[in-house]
Amino acid sequence: MDPSKGFEYVAGDYYQTSGVAPPTSNGAGSNVSPYFPYHAYPTSSTNGATGGSMYGTPQQTSAYAMYPPGPGSSPEEAFPEHTTTKIVEGCEAKYNVKGKKMRKPRTIYNSSQLQMLQKKFQKTQYLALPDRAALAHELGLSQTQVKIWFQNRRSKQKKQKGGSSDHASDEEDDDTEESKPESPPMGESVMIQESSEPRTLVSSSIKTEMKEEYPPMTLNEQYASPYLYGSDFSTILPPSQGFPNNALYNTAGAYPSIDYTNGVYQNTLYKYV
C-alpha cells in the first residue's frame, strides 16, 4: 500500500467526519497531513522541479484559521452555557465563567424611601419577614434591599454609639486630670515639709525633756561638782565664794574667769595652777 494514499484516505476521512472543507492545493502539489496541519511550501530541487515539504512558513496561514470564530468576542458570549443566572428573592445574581458572583450596581434610594425606612427603623431595628415584605412592596423595593439597608443602619448606629462613649470617657479623664493638683517631685515635697515645720517647737521640746531628766542644781551642787559642766555651763559666782579672782575650776586646763572690780564683771582667761 502506498503511504501517500493512506495519508490521503485518513485526511479525507478526517475532513468528512469533521465537516470542514479541506484546504485547496496551491498548484505546486502540496499536501496536508492530519498530523502536521500546515501547508507545504514549494521547494526547488536540483533538477528544477518543485517538491513538497511538511513544514510550513510563518507567513502562510495555519490550519487553525479554517475554523470560524465564535459568535462573540467575550467568553460569556462565546460560551453562554457557562454563565448562570440565580434569582434570589426577586433579584437576579449573575456569575461569571470562574464562578464568582458579579457585583451589582449600588442601590440609590430616593428621599421618600429613605424617610419611610428611617421612620420604620425608629420603631424597630429588626423586621420580621411579613413586615419586611410589606415594607418592600410599599416602597417598591426588593426584600433584599430593605434587609441590607437595615443591616447598614444598625452597624452605623453601633459605630456612632461607640464613638460617643469613647469621646465621653476622654472628657471625663480630662476633667479628673484638671481637678487633681499638681504634686511636686519627691525632693521638693520633703524640703517643703521641713521648711514648714517650726524649728522653735523642736528646740522647746528638747529643753523640756532635758529639764525633766536633769532638774536644776543648787549653787552648792554646782560648786561641789564643777567637772560635770564645761565652760559653756559655767555659772557666775559672787565674789564672796573665796576663789582666786572669782574663777571657776575647769578640768580642761583652760577656763574662763570673771573678775569683779568696782561692781563690774570682767571676763579673763587664765590657767589655774
From Swiss-Prot:
Residues 47-79, 153-204 are annotated as: Disordered. Residues 102-161 bind DNA. InterPro entries: Distal-less_Homeobox_TF (IPR050460), HD (IPR001356), HD_metazoa (IPR020479), Homeobox_CS (IPR017970), Homeodomain-like_sf (IPR009057), HTH_motif (IPR000047). The keyword DNA-binding applies. GO terms for cellular component: nucleus. Pfam families: Homeodomain (PF00046). GO terms for molecular function: cis-regulatory region sequence-specific DNA binding; DNA-binding transcription factor activity; DNA-binding transcription factor activity, RNA polymerase II-specific; RNA polymerase II cis-regulatory region sequence-specific DNA binding. Its main location: nucleus. Disulfide bonds: none annotated. Predominantly expressed in the head hypdodermis, neuronal support cells and CAN neurons. Coiled coil: none annotated. GO terms for biological process: cell adhesion; cell differentiation; dopaminergic neuron differentiation; embryo development ending in birth or egg hatching; regulation of transcription by RNA polymerase II. It is found in: Nucleus. Changing R103K: In ot406; significantly more pronounced defect in the expression of dopamine pathway genes in adults compared with young larvae. Keywords: DNA-binding, Homeobox, Nucleus. Belongs to the distal-less homeobox family. Probable transcription factor. Binds to the sequence motif 5'-ATAAT-3' in regulatory elements. Required for development of the anterior hypodermis during embryonic morphogenesis for cell adhesion; also affects embryonic and larval viability. Modulates and maintains dopaminergic neuron differentiation. May activate dopamine pathway genes in concert with ETS domain-containing protein ast-1, and homeobox proteins ceh-40 and ceh-20. This is Homeobox protein ceh-43.
